[in-house]
Amino acid sequence: MDQKVKIARAALHMWEEPCISGTRGSGAVFFTGCNLRCCFCQNREIAIGDSGLEITEERLAEIFLELQEKDAANINLVTGTHYIPQIIAALDCAKKHGLNIPVVYNCGGYENTETLKLLDGYVDIYLPDYKYAESELAVKFSHANDYPERAMEAVNEMVRQTGMPQFDAEGYMKRGTIVRHLILPGHTRNSKKVLKLLYKTFGKQIYISIMNQYTPVFEQKEYTELNRCVTRREYEKVLDYAFELGIETVSYTHLRAHETEL
């Protein structure tokens, strides 16, 4: 085993969805790099920076086992798209040495379905984003004009692999797909379109996680609407729409104390 990967962090992570982190924490491995270049990236240093440590596939397998020993609820592979062959090799090695907790594939949604098929049988839970239903925003903020179509194809493949969501007695997800959507300030119309599209296409086959924690990480000179957090009114407007649609399999974050009332 001599192929290397670069990871920025590996630790118990307590801030994923409740059915992923719970009280035990998710065994998150943050890979350096990302296949998207979102101008509002909330993990910019990891996604487009050069931070991190190069390790072998064998060491990656050891990290998976160490996280399991720390009672991680799962192994959470964060933005690992560009390292899939190495991840598969590390999972094979770790499973031979006793890895038996669910594997989560945590990504931005902009995936190739043929690549995802390589993960069939390795990944138990998919945790993709679905950022845009509007191509104009995909081009504007992520330079990915085909994001809506490509991400939808990816989620279709993920659902094909995982089937209906399954949970254990403690409420942790064992298998399934959770699609995340981060509300962007000033763009509730896009969020509503995302929810309608996901619910119409997948119904109860997926969980939808509606996130309001967008934070400006630096001043946007070109896209000034992104220089603020999502307001309480914007967030509640999107949540209300989700409930109007009849979405029951939805997860959402609590409103933050510093949010404005606008």
Ranges and model annotations:
Residues 122-134, 207-213:
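Non-cysteine beta-strand/loop elements that form the S-adenosyl-L-methionine
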Residues 64, 88-91, 116, 155, ...:
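Generic structural signal for well-ordered alpha-helices
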Residues 80-82, 108-110, 182-184, 211-215, ...:
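Active-site beta-loop-alpha junctions enriched in small/polar residues
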Residues 1-121, 125, 134-135:
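Conserved Radical SAM active-site core
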Residues 254-262:
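Single conserved hydrophobic/aromatic residue that forms the stacking wall/gate
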Residues 45-51, 140-145, 222-229:
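Short glycine-enriched, charge-decorated loop/helix-capping segments at active-site entrances
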Residues 142-144, 155-190, 194, 212-213, ...:
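Conserved strand-turn element in the central/C-terminal portion of the radical SAM core barrel
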